[in-house]
Amino acid sequence: MRKFFLFFLLACLSAAVAEAQPDFHAGFGGFGGAEPDFKDVNYAGDDLEAHRLDIYLPKTDGGSYKAVVAIYGSAWFSNNMKAITYFSLGKPLVEAGFAVICINHRSSGDAKYPAQIHDVKAAIRFIRANAAKFKIDASFIGITGFSSGGHLSSMAGVTNGLKDAEGEVGGNLTFSSEVNAVVDWFGPVDMSRMNKCETVNDEKSPEAALIGGAPKDNPEKVKEISPVSYVAKAEKLPKFLVVHGDADNVVPYCQSKFFSEELRKKGVLEEFITVPDGQHGPVTFNEDTYKKMTEFFKKEAGMK
């Protein structure tokens, strides 16, 4: 079942990228183009594939570049899909003048939550600690991701400054893991309402694998992994842009609707973009939504 889900997700993503970015071919899944400027950098000081990242820099001599961390979707089942993140989200950001950091993270098979958010925060601290080496202007670090990567991106935003979510992966604990802006692409954000927008999913669901048990038997863990649970009490929320297709048959469209309503109450929702007939990747990834993403990050970063 997990292999089928990953195949389905990759097929959807490949179709989406082909539709939205028809000008680059070869490499992963038939797509190619840029090679990272820094490849397979380990951000945790170990030898895990799950703790590697790639950095792509703009092809201009800008000295240092404000940055966006990008996270793949895999239903948390993969620990090594950073290569596709550039082609799904990173390319338009690099072209807009950002350094893009595509990260791996531990899968639900490697370790249960909160290992995944600890990895994300470790990568951000690592980038801040080594900003000069990688030509990054760490005064702005945004984050974006699709599907489960959207979940982790949103989680990074809603837990800004929350010590309990920090972890100690890779050290660099004197550096901040806070993010300055978030773009969530159809991420699951309320695990208590994943089944028909009303109830939890069953014990065979990806979120069950993430927490190591049936959601119905673990209400506190369900709350812990749901970004929507943190919004009301969060003290350092960045601005959010949320994108979701209303024909998504993997992550219910209502997930982003619920989340956006809570973000709006806190005054941190830039926009909730509904893509008519948008699926879990196809149609939702398009020239207009990419432009919305880059313009939002540029605005929050103070870039012209």
Feature locations, PLM:
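Mobile cap/lid helix-loop segments that gate and shape the active-site cleft of serine hydrolases
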Residues: 23, 27-35, 165, 170, ...
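Short amphipathic alpha-helix adjacent to the substrate-entry channel of hydrolases
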Residues: 82-101
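Primarily recognizes the serine-hydrolase "nucleophile elbow" in alpha/beta-hydrolase
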Residues: 125-197
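Short beta-strand element of the alpha/beta-hydrolase
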Residues: 64-74
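Catalytic histidine-centered segment of alpha/beta-hydrolase-like enzymes
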Residues: 278-287
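Short beta-strand/loop motif that positions the catalytic acidic residue
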Residues: 241-244, 248
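N-terminal cap/lid segment of alpha/beta-hydrolase-fold proteins
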Residues: 21-63
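Alpha/beta-hydrolase active-site loop
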Residues: 112-132
